[in-house]
Structures are given as C-alpha cells and as structure tokens.
C-alpha cells in the first residue's frame, strides 16, 4: 500500500502555526514511508475564502520547505461530485430528505435544552413516507446514521476511541440550496484522492465518528486516523495570538529560518529520545506516529528563538547574506551597493555569532552598510567625548596608518603594542575604536571589523569620529 496523506486548510486567513505543524507531520509521515503528500484547499465557505489567503497558504508551506505532490485540489470545484454522492445515498435508502423548518428545529433544540437533554436532531423525517412531504417545500438531505451500537476508531495517536451511536444524530449532507456540507465534501475528497492516513488536530476527533459512518454508508474503505494534540501557550491555555498563534509568515518576518521552525514544530508533540536538534533528513528517517504524545504541547517563544540562533550560526554565510540584504534595504530605504553586500558577506561569520533572528542580525549589521559620517549611539558618543579615549584612538590611527598588511592579526598586534607603550590594557584601545567603527559599544571582534571594512573605510571612520561626529540617523551605502 502506498501511503497518501493530505493537508487541507481553509483559506479564511493566514497559515497559523498549528496548521504548519499539521502540514509538517503529514509531510514527514508520507516521506518516511515513500508515499505522497497532497494539498487540498477547503474553500467551500465562499463568504470567507479569499485568493489572498490561498496564496498565503501556498507561500507558508513553501517557506517551511514542504513540497506537495501533484496539483493542489480546490474543494469548491468538486461540489457537483459531492452532491452526486449524496444523491446516490438517497437512491440507496442510506440518506433521506428532511423537511423540518428552521423554526421547528429551533423549537426542538429549546425543548431539549429545557429538559437537560443533548441537542440532537431526533430523526423526524427518517422513516416518514415521501407522500407526507409538503408540496414544493425545501428540504435538506441527511445521512441515515446507525441508531444502535457504537462507532469505534482505532486512532494511531489517541488509541481506541468510541462513541455510542445514539449520541450522534443524522448529519446534513446537502443543504436546502443543494450545496454539500463540509462533512460530506471532506469524506468524498479524501476517498477520491486515495488518502490512506488522516493526520490532523484532535479538535477534529468528534468529526471522525460522523465521517466514519459516512464512509461505511458509501461502502468505502475508512482511512486510518491520527489525531494530534493541539498546541497550548506557556500557561497551558489554548494557544492564542498573545501566546504566539501567528501566521507562519509572521515568524518569517520576525527573522526565523525555515529549518529552525521545522525543527521546533517537530518537537511540539513528537520526540526522538533526548534529541533536540534534528535535521530534516533525520526527521524523515525517524518520524513515526508512535512517538507523538497525547498531551498538548506548550509553545515556548524563547526556546524557538534560541533554536533559531543555533541554526543561524550553522547556516551558510552566502545564504544568510541573501536573506539579510532585503531586510537592510527595508531598514535604510536604499538599495545596497555591491561593495556593501560584499562587506556583509565577508563579515557574516562574526555577525551571526551574536544574533538569534535575522531581524537581530540586520540590526547588528547596519554599521557595515552605513554611510559616513557614522552615527554614534549614546554610549559610543559618550566614549568619544572622553579626551583620553580620543587620544588613544588618535595614537592608534597613527600606529596603523602606514601598516603593511591590513589583517585582524596585524591590527590587533598594533593595538597591543600601543596599549603596552601607554601602560594600558587592550580594552582601552578597543573601546573608542569600536565606537568609531561601529557607532556602538557592541560589535563583532573589532579587529575583524577593521579587516572587513578595509583600510580606507576604517581610517575614514576614525577620522570622522575624531572630528566630532554626533548621533544622527545612519543611511545605507
């Protein structure tokens, strides 16, 4: 048997983080078994479905690095097929027309509520002859669900789950306007797409019982279900926007790398021993549903950020530069020159050691692409206001101005010689040097910075600082 999974989001908003994890688990399960991962857009809610949301879903899945097989299926386009199945069930006596009005149904629910009874449709038209039907009256089509016994689902995550059939009513398959309901569309599409495993959030578990009954009524093989626990916030409450229930695109914009997000989402509910850092290749090899827990996972933004820092430190410098350039151009409002981009690429090794997100990296890299005279932050300006610091900086400028090889080693050696000659520690030389070159009290190793900037730019920034540059707004070169 070829394993076939699917991810089936509704295009009524962004691809949220829980949906991203569901897509990942389906993708991993399919790839682990050498099967297929399909994508279906459940756009039957025409009032809320938008083209922009569809594109956001596509973009989010692609950004996560999840490829799907074949063309994405648009559910609304298959409405005729869904209705066809309902009519076939009518012909076979497995479904029936219900002529109850909304007022009648409301009255039934209110009576049940008053008596403390479960609010379920009582099957009024289930066995009534067609001759009782009001002439020309609108009707819905309902499934004639089993009234006795129980429905049992062997769930790969939750174990055996069961419900007494008298707890389920006869669900609507076709509305009064002839359009299919979500429950009908899902079952027909999963069958026609050959889905073997339905992996989704456990908030769909109650739907599974009704869908199971519909599969049986149609005489189709029921797929294997796996309902994964939802993601909660750090406080144990259902994940919301205040916890970080944002769209996948928001995490991209906050500067997270897709490989870090994949790793983090994987560990939200799935484990492989004590392994925390898991590559995508390892995840494909190791992923099984046996290792998915039954308890909700808690979203930890700090842990995600630290994990992202790990992946940034190990990422290719050229790739990080490509991601960084548009962020810096957005910050500065100017296109970066080829020289600035080359400078970023050369200095990336030092830059990425400190940053945990691409946004942090962009903030820390601004000084590399800033135009002269360089803006100084408050601490750097205070340093340059100190006469001893400026004297040390001026002396260092003289020391390196005619230096032969402009490398971090020769530049550091020159600073050490000067510090020793002036009876100071190296930090006393490095502090004003960092202020002049980076406009800040924090930067990558300062002699590495000088090597990246080059002789002309470094000496020019030192001259600017000694000339009394004050804090302004930096712009890109």
UniProtKB/Swiss-Prot annotation:
CDD domains: GluRS_core
Binding residues for ATP: 241
Domain of life: Bacteria
One matching Pfam family: Anticodon_2
Gene Ontology CC terms, in alphabetical order: cytosol
UniProt cross-references to PROSITE patterns, sorted A to Z: AA_TRNA_LIGASE_I
GO molecular function: ATP binding; glutamate-tRNA ligase activity; tRNA binding; zinc ion binding
Motif placement: 'KMSKS' region: 238-242
Keywords recorded for this protein, A-Z: Aminoacyl-tRNA synthetase, ATP-binding, Cytoplasm, Ligase, Nucleotide-binding, Protein biosynthesis
Motif ('HIGH' region): 9-19
GO annotation (BP), single: glutamyl-tRNA aminoacylation
Assembly information from the UniProt record: Monomer.
Its biological purpose: Catalyzes the attachment of glutamate to tRNA(Glu) in a two-step reaction: glutamate is first activated by ATP to form Glu-AMP and then transferred to the acceptor end of tRNA(Glu).
Family: Belongs to the class-I aminoacyl-tRNA synthetase family. Glutamate--tRNA ligase type 1 subfamily.
UniProt name for this protein: Glutamate--tRNA ligase 2
Organism: Paramagnetospirillum magneticum (strain ATCC 700264 / AMB-1)
């Amino acid at each position: 048997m070829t394993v076939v999974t699917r991810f089936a989001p509704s295009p009524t908003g962004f691809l949220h983080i829980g949906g991203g994890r569901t897509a990942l688990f389906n993708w991993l399960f399919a790839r682990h078994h050498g099967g297929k991962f399909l994508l279906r857009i459940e756009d039957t809610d025409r009032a809320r479905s938008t083209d922009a949301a569809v594109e956001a879903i596509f973009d989010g899945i692609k950004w996560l690095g999840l490829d799907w097989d074949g063309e994405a299926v648009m559910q609304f386009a298959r409405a005729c097929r869904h209705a066809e199945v309902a009519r076939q069930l009518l012909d076979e006596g497995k479904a029936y027309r219900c002529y109850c009005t909304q007022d009648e149904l409301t009255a039934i629910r209110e009576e049940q509520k008053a008596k403390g009874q479960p609010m379920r449709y009582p099957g009024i038209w289930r066995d009534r002859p067609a001759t009782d039907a009001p002439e020309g009256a609108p009707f819905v089509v309902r499934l004639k669900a089993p009234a006795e016994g129980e429905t049992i689902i062997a769930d790969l995550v939750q174990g055996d789950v069961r419900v007494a059939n008298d707890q389920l009513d006869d669900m609507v398959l076709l509305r009064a306007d002839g359009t299919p309901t979500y429950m009908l569309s899902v079952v027909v599409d999963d069958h026609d797409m050959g889905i073997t495993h339905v992996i989704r959030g456990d908030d769909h578990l109650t739907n599974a019982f009704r869908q199971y009954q519909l599969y049986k009524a149609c005489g189709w093989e029921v797929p294997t279900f796996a309902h994964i626990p939802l993601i909660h916030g750090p406080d144990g409450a259902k994940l919301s926007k205040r916890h970080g229930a944002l769209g996948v695109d928001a995490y991209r914009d906050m500067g997270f790398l897709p490989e870090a997000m994949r790793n983090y989402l994987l560990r939200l509910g799935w484990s492989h021993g004590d392994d925390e850092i898991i590559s995508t290749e390892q995840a494909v090899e190791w992923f099984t549903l046996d290792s998915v827990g039954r308890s909700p996972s808690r979203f930890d933004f700090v842990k995600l950020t630290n994990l992202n820092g790990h992946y940034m430190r190990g990422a290719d410098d050229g790739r990080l530069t490509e991601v960084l350039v548009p962020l810096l151009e957005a910050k500065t409002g100017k296109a970066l020159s080829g020289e600035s981009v080359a400078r970023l690429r050369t200095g990336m090794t030092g830059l990425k050691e400190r940053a945990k997100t691409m946004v942090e990296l962009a903030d820390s890299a601004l000084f590399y692409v800033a135009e002269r005279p360089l803006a100084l932050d408050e601490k750097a300006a205070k340093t340059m206001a100190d006469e001893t610091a400026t004297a040390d900086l001026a002396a260092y400028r003289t020391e390196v101005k005619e230096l032969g090889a402009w490398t971090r080693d020769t530049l550091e050696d020159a600073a050490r010689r000067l510090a020793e000659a002036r009876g100071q520690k190296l930090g006393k030389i490095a502090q004003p040097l960092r202020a002049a070159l980076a406009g800040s009290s924090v930067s990558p190793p300062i002699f590495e910075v000088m090597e990246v900037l080059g002789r002309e730019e470094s000496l020019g920034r030192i001259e600017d600082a000694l000339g009394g540059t004050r804090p302004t707004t930096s712009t890109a070169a």
